[in-house]
Amino acid sequence: MTLSVLSRKDKERVIRRLLLQAPPGEFVNAFDDLCLLIRDEKLMHHQGECAGHQHCQKYSVPLCIDGNPVLLSHHNVMGDYRFFDHQSKLSFKYDLLQNQLKDIQSHGIIQNEAEYLRVVLLCALKLYVNDHYPKGNCNMLRKTVKSKEYLIACIEDHNYETGECWNGLWKSKWIFQVNPFLTQVTGRIFVQAHFFRCVNLHIEISKDLKESLEIVNQAQLALSFARLVEEQENKFQAAVLEELQELSNEALRKILRRDLPVTRTLIDWHRILSDLNLVMYPKLGYVIYSRSVLCNWII
């Protein structure tokens, strides 16, 4: 069935689904390609706006406001396609297709102990990110849910090399409740890479974590939290590199329904691992092996 015979509602669903499949750094390219097929500017603009908003949340798209990095995520969404930045105390809309902030408004925040703690933790997190990532960005967000205060740390680094036929993203988030004495940190680390020379290879690797953290005072908590993030990300990177090294031709044949064509001889695995290392920059630590890799090959 072609797009021309689909109802408008079905077209909207297909367009949005295709746009949401765009890898990090490739949303605008996917949108432009679809525009050539759809040839309905109004429909594409509306779906691009909706899908772009979701894409920003999914991949923690970084912005810069007043010289400070801002990571977009569902944790700082306000509704009506708006985001909120604690640092600048601004709310805004972001047009991913035009890479432009829109409808910027001031937005006050409550200055309480949780806010002071957020600022201290952000300073410690910035020191860690600047030391471990080539072009890393981080945010520390605060949220109140049922009268309980939560702090959310977000980290992102990417390297989009479309000219070299690959893109890579590393992101993580860490959430904990502001409690006296002891709190539980829930974390998730996510890596995605896309290679599109000769074959189309998508790699997604993620890991969920839970760790306890003692709370004595703000300074101690900030240092302990940054140390926890460093240890867990180091372990994760070491496990990722070990797992990628196991993706030899023999291992790939076992997960493929058919052998790769002759063009597989052009794949330079050493270069791929070297390129990935530019994205996954944290220093190596102890290895915790975790098998959670999804590889999709489209010949």
UniProtKB/Swiss-Prot annotation:
PROSITE patterns: F_ACTIN_CAPPING_A_1, F_ACTIN_CAPPING_A_2. InterPro entries: CapZ_alpha, CapZ_alpha/beta, CapZ_alpha/beta_2, CapZ_alpha_1, F-actin_cap_asu_CS. It is found in: Cytoplasm, Cytoskeleton. One of its GO terms (cellular component) is sperm head. GO terms for biological process: actin cytoskeleton organization; actin filament organization; barbed-end actin filament capping; cytoplasm organization; spermatid development. Pfam families: F-actin_cap_A. Keywords: Actin capping, Actin-binding, Cytoplasm, Cytoskeleton, Phosphoprotein. This is F-actin-capping protein subunit alpha-3. It comes from Homo sapiens (Human). The gene is CAPZA3.
